[in-house]
Amino acid sequence: MVGKICGTGSYAPHRVMDNHDLAKIVETSDEWIRERTGIGKRHIIEEETTSYMAGQAALRAVEQSGIDPAEIELIILATSSSETVFPCAACEVQKTIGAVHAAGYDMNAACTGFVLAFNTAQAYISAGIYQTVMVIGADSMSNLVDWTDRGTCILFGDGAG
């Protein structure tokens, strides 16, 4: 059995921090950041949480896919920045989208998290354990990053998909 992507959704916070904004708080420049990373701007949370962003992305994916949330059997949320230890953020997404029959868990694997979660979902489907799995990647790294460290703060933003 092979899995397929039935729908996608994303959420990015409204607040945008461009490289010029970042240069006001750490010694850097737009040119320096772009040369090293190609990044020109990043989305930053204000009131949102990781689970909120994941839930909004999930709602959009469900809408696009046409799948009844009650058909979802498992939700895997790849995140390194959940705001709570429990319930896991995947359980918050389950509640948000109405996936009343789904199990859910968070997977923390940093930058490779979404790929690992996707491969895990594929393995569950191939093994015949689940048929309908939702995979989400979501992080709010702006809460964790050291905004005085020019080498790392330029890399991270917030969002979900």
What residue spans do the PLM features occupy?
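Short, surface-exposed acidic/glycine-rich loop or hinge patches that mediate macromolecular interfaces
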Residues: 48, 80-83
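Conserved beta-strand segments that form the floor/walls of ligand-binding pockets within enzyme
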Residues: 4, 76, 106
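Conserved "HGTGT" condensation-loop signature of ketosynthase/thiolase-family condensing enzymes
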Residues: 1-73, 97
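Acyl-thioester C-C bond-transforming condensing/cleaving domain
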Residues: 59, 63-70, 82-161
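Short glycine-rich or small-residue beta-strand-to-loop segments that form or flank ligand, phosphate
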Residues: 74-80
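Residue-level detector of alpha-helix boundaries and kinks
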Residues: 18, 43, 78, 102, ...
